[in-house]
């Protein structure tokens, strides 16, 4: 009985609570960073240096009454819960250094669940019965499906490097050097694709304020809106943690496993800061530019690199490092 409680209740809670706390403070960091980049202060009233601002925002949103438009679909309108559930489930196979769910095909698990997140966006846009929400949802589906093709091919290339589908093997592969150095074109395309996958600027066409009011979540208020918000930021942290594992090596130490967690989270935090920097620096892409980037640039490049990495091992009679 104790094992069941630890495995199925305590372990998931132990990783969910820090993720939700990190999400809360990522929103604060984003507002502060954007503030200083625009030569203003950002939140600095609630608590010392504005540190209690995310708590105040959370309390304010969750005590508001969740309003549902009379013309909306009541069953599909609860999809923000699915968005957050998927965002938190994705953290299960992350090697920090020991995963909550030790899966043999953890990369495929992450790819499959990140694809499912589109359904929560599409369903909420459809359920709102608003043309702005529907257009935002359709944009999200089109761009996510487009970029997942290149994401899958980039993952295939790094799997060829490491010789395994488990995320722990990447620590072994990168003991000598980070994969971001020999495979820097892959790392650059992966990072840009994760920006798009999380609907961040300059690819935030799903919630283009100047065109679609607020995008797919325009009819949501209070708690359900906060759940979408939490899911978006949990996905940002997850994608950056995954980028750190795949390309920046999580430097596993058998004597000090907590050192692995510390270095991994530091790398993920730095990559998240670059997300904020990009948001402050670049204007939004036009929709046709977004599609041209993936279908005319990323797809041919990633296909060429997959063929190149496959042919290299055959030509040099080499095998993945630990095979």
Swiss-Prot record:
Enzymatic class: translocase
> What molecular function terms (GO) are annotated for this protein?
NADH dehydrogenase (ubiquinone) activity
Report the InterPro entries cross-referenced here: NADH_UbQ_OxRdtase_su1/FPO, NADH_UbQ_OxRdtase_su1_CS
Electron transport found in the keyword field:
yes
User: What does the record give as the reaction this protein catalyses?
Assistant: a ubiquinone + NADH + 5 H(+)(in) = a ubiquinol + NAD(+) + 4 H(+)(out)
Residues passing through the membrane, by range: 9-29, 76-96, 107-127, 145-165, 175-195, 227-247, 258-278, 298-318
Q: Where in the cell is it found?
A: Mitochondrion inner membrane
The UniProt record lists the keyword Secreted? no
Q: Do you know which Pfam families this protein is assigned to?
A: NADHdh
UniProt-listed PROSITE patterns: COMPLEX1_ND1_1, COMPLEX1_ND1_2
* Keyword line: Electron transport, Membrane, Mitochondrion, Mitochondrion inner membrane, NAD, Respiratory chain, Translocase, Transmembrane, Transmembrane helix, Transport, Ubiquinone
Its Gene Ontology cellular component terms are: mitochondrial inner membrane
The membrane topology noted for this protein in its Swiss-Prot or TrEMBL record is:
Multi-pass membrane protein
Q: Which family does it belong to?
A: Belongs to the complex I subunit 1 family.
Give the protein's biological function: Core subunit of the mitochondrial membrane respiratory chain NADH dehydrogenase (Complex I) that is believed to belong to the minimal assembly required for catalysis. Complex I functions in the transfer of electrons from NADH to the respiratory chain. The immediate electron acceptor for the enzyme is believed to be ubiquinone.
Give the protein name, as stated in the record. NADH-ubiquinone oxidoreductase chain 1
Q: Which organism is it from?
A: Gadus morhua (Atlantic cod)
């Amino acid at each position: 009985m104790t094992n069941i409680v630890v495995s199925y209740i305590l372990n998931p809670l132990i990783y969910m609570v820090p993720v939700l706390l990190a999400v809360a403070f990522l929103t604060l960091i984003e507002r502060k960073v954007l503030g200083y980049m625009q030569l203003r202060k950002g939140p600095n009233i609630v608590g010392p240096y504005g540190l209690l601002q995310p708590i105040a925002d959370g309390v304010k949103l969750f005590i508001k009454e969740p309003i549902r438009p009379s013309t909306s679909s009541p069953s599909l309108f609860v999809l923000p819960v699915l968005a957050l559930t998927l965002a938190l489930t994705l953290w299960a196979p992350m090697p920090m250094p020991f995963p909550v769910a030790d899966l043999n095909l953890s990369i495929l698990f992450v790819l499959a669940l990140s694809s499912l997140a589109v359904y929560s966006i599409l369903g909420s846009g459809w359920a709102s019965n608003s043309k702005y929400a529907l257009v935002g949802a359709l944009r999200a589906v089109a761009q996510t499906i487009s970029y997942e093709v290149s994401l899958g091919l980039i993952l295939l290339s790094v799997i060829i490097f490491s010789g395994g589908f488990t995320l722990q093997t990447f620590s072994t592969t990168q003991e000598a050097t980070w994969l971001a150095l020999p495979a820097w074109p892959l790392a650059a395309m992966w990072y840009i694709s994760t920006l798009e996958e999380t609907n961040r600027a300059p690819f935030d066409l799903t919630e283009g304020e100047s065109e679609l009011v607020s995008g797919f979540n325009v009819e949501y208020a209070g708690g359900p809106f906060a759940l979408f918000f939490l899911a978006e930021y949990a996905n940002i942290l997850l994608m950056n943690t995954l980028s750190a594992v795949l390309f920046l090596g999580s430097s596993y130490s058998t004597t000090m496993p907590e050192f692995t967690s510390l270095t991994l989270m530091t790398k993920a935090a730095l990559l998240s800061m670059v997300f904020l920097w990009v948001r402050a620096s670049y204007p939004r892409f036009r929709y046709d530019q977004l599609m041209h980037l993936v279908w005319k640039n990323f797809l041919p490049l990633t296909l060429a690199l997959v063929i190149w990495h496959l042919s290299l091992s055959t030509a040099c009679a080499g095998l993945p490092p630990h095979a």
